[in-house]
Swiss-Prot record:
Gene Ontology biological-process entries: phagocytosis; regulation of cell shape; regulation of Rho protein signal transduction; regulation of signal transduction
This protein's name: CDC42 small effector protein 2
Lipidation (S-palmitoyl cysteine): 10-11
Entry text on domains: The CRIB domain mediates interaction with CDC42.
The keyword Cytoplasm is assigned to this record: yes
Keywords recorded for this protein, A-Z: Cell membrane, Cell projection, Cell shape, Cytoplasm, Cytoskeleton, Lipoprotein, Membrane, Palmitate, Phagocytosis, Phosphoprotein
Species name: Homo sapiens (Human)
Function comment: Probably involved in the organization of the actin cytoskeleton by acting downstream of CDC42, inducing actin filament assembly. Alters CDC42-induced cell shape changes. In activated T-cells, may play a role in CDC42-mediated F-actin accumulation at the immunological synapse. May play a role in early contractile events in phagocytosis in macrophages.
CDD domains for this protein: CRIB
Residue intervals of the CRIB domain: 29-42
Family: Belongs to the CDC42SE/SPEC family.
Pfam family name, one: PBD
Description of how the protein assembles with itself and partners: Interacts with CDC42 (in GTP-bound form). Interacts weakly with RAC1 and not at all with RHOA.
Gene name in the database record: CDC42SE2
Length: 84
């Protein structure tokens, strides 16, 4: 007795290859457009208290471009993470 194998390609769906994300390197990234430096905030500026945060926000708003926001009251808890 002999064996007979018949393959129906129409019945077997080919699995699509997973799409690989294109790797981005430095040459693909251009210069910033419409960039305006309005303020510099260092890590120590935020640890000096909420009054400092308010003054930074006021300084940035005085430079323009921040008029579309809505005022909101925010309460934050400061957690000191000094390495012992």
């Amino acid at each position: 007795m002999s064996e007979f194998w018949l393959c129906f390609n129409c019945c077997i769906a080919e699995q699509p290859q997973p799409k690989r994300r294109r790797r981005i390197d430095r040459s693909m990234i251009g210069e910033p457009t419409n960039f305006v430096h309005t303020a510099h905030v260092g890590s120590g500026d935020l640890f000096s208290g909420m009054n400092s945060v308010s003054s930074i926000q006021n300084q940035m708003q005085s430079k323009g471009g921040y008029g579309g926001g809505m005022p909101a009251n925010v309460q934050m808890q400061l957690v000191d993470t000094k390495a012992g």
